[in-house]
A protein has these predicted regions:
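RNA pseudouridine synthases
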Residues: 1-241
Length: 241
């Protein structure tokens, strides 16, 4: 990121034409020779987390877990200890795939922290590769149930857009007309709740054809029907008493 590069420059880690330069505003000239000294980041060791996993299926290759809302999938900024991965280390640290990120052993796919539902964990690299191929080919069906503000018309349909990182908040995603990755969400209204005392709510099933970051949340927000309880992509509605 820009801030990391600036910090490297201010810490005398940049040489231009073999001379240390610690001025981030230095303007490069044609022919300048640039050297960066970048120290490898220290990998956080994964600590076991005593957390009761709701295991619905397990064999020699996979573990299927019913993830609760409120727990992150894997370690990240601000939380390196209390995640599903840490709980898996505590449960079965010697039998998890090690393909990819060292902080995500066994993790083939993810769901958001405040989302509950089934996740599949790979216990070995062969299972990880097979599962990854299935997710990439979209041969695994993923259906999510959610409660949204308002009601969608038509009550059943497909949302197909490009999704990219928000230009205003790098921790959020947004729909774009010109850039990003294709995102496809099929939705169906199951039930509508409406009365004179509270805002209208709708219960939906959403089936994903792609798996972009925050895809359903972004698509619902794009339609103007954000998910109830979603503080990041919420619309302003009066509180339900």
């Amino acid at each position: 990121s820009r801030s990391k590069v600036k910090k490297l420059i201010l810490s005398n880690n940049l040489k231009i034409n073999q001379v240390i330069v610690n001025d981030p505003s230095y303007v490069l000239k044609l022919g300048d020779n640039i050297e960066f000294c970048i120290q490898p980041e220290k990998i956080q060791s994964l600590k076991p987390y005593e957390y009761k996993l709701d295991i619905v299926f397990e064999d020699d290759d996979i573990i299927v877990i019913n993830k609760s809302s409120g727990i992150s999938m894997h370690p990240g900024a601000g939380n390196y200890d209390n995640t599903i991965v840490n709980a898996l280390i505590n449960y079965n640290k010697n039998s998890l795939s090690n393909i990819g990120d060292e902080l995500r052993p066994g993790i083939v796919h993810r769901i958001d922290k405040n989302t509950s539902g089934l996740i599949v964990v790979a216990k070995n690299n062969q299972a990880h590769e097979h599962l990854s191929k299935q997710f990439n080919k979209h041969s695994i069906t993923r259906i999510y149930q959610l409660l949204i503000w308002g009601k969608i018309r038509p009550s059943k349909g497909k949302i197909e857009t490009l999704i990219t990182r928000s230009s205003k908040n790098r921790q959020m995603m947004e729909v774009s007309r010109t850039k990003g990755k294709k995102a496809i969400t099929n939705y169906e209204t199951l039930q509508i709740f409406e009365n004179d005392k509270t805002p209208t709510l709708s219960l939906l099933n959403c089936k994903l054809e792609t798996g972009r970051t925050h895809q359903i949340r972004v698509h619902m927000n794009y339609l103007g029907n954000s998910i109830v309880g979603d503080d990041k992509y919420k619309k302003k509605f009066k509180k339900i008493k």
